[in-house]
Amino acid sequence: MSRIGKRPIPIPAGVQVELTPDNVVRVTGPKGQLELRLHPKMIVQRENGVVQVQRPSDERFFKQLHGLYRTLIANMVQGVTEGFRKDLEIHGVGYRAALEGKTLVLTVGYSHPVRIDPPPGISFIVESPTRIGVVGIDKQLVGEVAAQIRRVRPPEPYQGKGIRYAGEVIRRKAGKTGKTKGKK
């Protein structure tokens, strides 16, 4: 039995989990609604305020799906109650971020400002010109948008300039050493 897959998912107050006959799990909560289509043979049961994921057999494929689906459903429940947030930091002289309406505008050393429109369900928070927050209810989409922002100007290893995740450690490299005069 999968150690992760066998753990029940508690359903908090104000959250509704709906299981359709065509194996779609729909989670609705105060922040919105998320859907997940499951493999047709996987079994999801809801009873006594918890959701339990079960697999049809002990085949390797179903063992893999067991823990995955349990975690995805748990993330959906957490997303519609608390939401998810990924923070980014901007390092570099003159590098900054700003919001124009809902659009994120990045000035990161290019000849033009880079504009990023949020996909549906995602919003940006600019706490300071060097800190960006990506907020939403879908964990995968939040991470994807944060990675897309980081990709605009990834941190470089010599001076550390660029956009990085909050708390991310960048491995630094030593620069070139100069030639000594007189010796050949």
UniProtKB/Swiss-Prot annotation:
Gene Ontology MF terms in the entry: rRNA binding; structural constituent of ribosome
Pfam hit, one: Ribosomal_L6
Keywords: Ribonucleoprotein, Ribosomal protein, RNA-binding, rRNA-binding
GO cellular component: cytosolic large ribosomal subunit
Keyword Nucleotide-binding (UniProt): no
Top-rank taxon: Bacteria
InterPro entries for this protein: Ribosomal_uL6-like, Ribosomal_uL6-like_a/b-dom_sf, Ribosomal_uL6_a/b-dom, Ribosomal_uL6_bac-type
GO biological process: cytoplasmic translation
SUPFAM superfamilies linked to this entry: Ribosomal protein L6
Function: This protein binds to the 23S rRNA, and is important in its secondary structure. It is located near the subunit interface in the base of the L7/L12 stalk, and near the tRNA binding site of the peptidyltransferase center.
Assembly and interaction partners: Part of the 50S ribosomal subunit.
HAMAP family to which the protein is assigned, alphabetical: Ribosomal_uL6_B
Protein family membership: Belongs to the universal ribosomal protein uL6 family.
Protein name: Large ribosomal subunit protein uL6
